[in-house]
Amino acid sequence: ADIVMTQTPASVSEPVGGTVTIKCQASQSIFBBLAWYQKPGZPPKGLLYTBYTLASGVSSRFSGGGSGTBFTLTISDLECABAATYYCEXTGVSZBXBKGFGGG
């Protein structure tokens, strides 16, 4: 079955220096096979990969958590440059299921 990724909230506003948490829920367990991406950017900039490993050059202000079906992306000490659309993606999915992206 296809994996559906649902992100909440759809939008969030916090002051500079604050903290934001974005949630991502999978329609079935994906263990910890999740990545987070940031747009703008073509292709989208990878932030965190499986096991919550930070991509090269990404600030440690970004952190990930969760497993199974429920995941979070937390951005602390917010900066103006963090204003963007963030996407979760199920990775490492078996060949008989399509990978799912959150809605951003």
From Swiss-Prot:
Region entry Framework-4, spans: 101-104
GO CC annotation, single: immunoglobulin complex
Region (Complementarity-determining-1): 25-35
Annotated region described as Framework-3, given as residue ranges: 57-88
Region (Framework-1) location: 1-24
Complementarity-determining-3 as annotated region, ranges: 89-100
Pfam families registered for this protein in UniProt: V-set (PF07686)
Signal peptide residue numbers: none
Region feature (Framework-2): 36-49
GO biological process: adaptive immune response
Keywords, alphabetical: Adaptive immunity, Immunity, Immunoglobulin
UniProt-annotated stretches for the region Complementarity-determining-2: 50-56
InterPro entries, per database record: Ig-like_dom (IPR007110), Ig-like_dom_sf (IPR036179), Ig-like_fold (IPR013783), Ig_sub (IPR003599), Ig_V-set (IPR013106), IgV_Light_Chain (IPR050150)
Other notes: Residues 24, 53 and 56 were not positively identified.
Record-given protein name: Ig kappa chain V region XP-1
Organism: Oryctolagus cuniculus
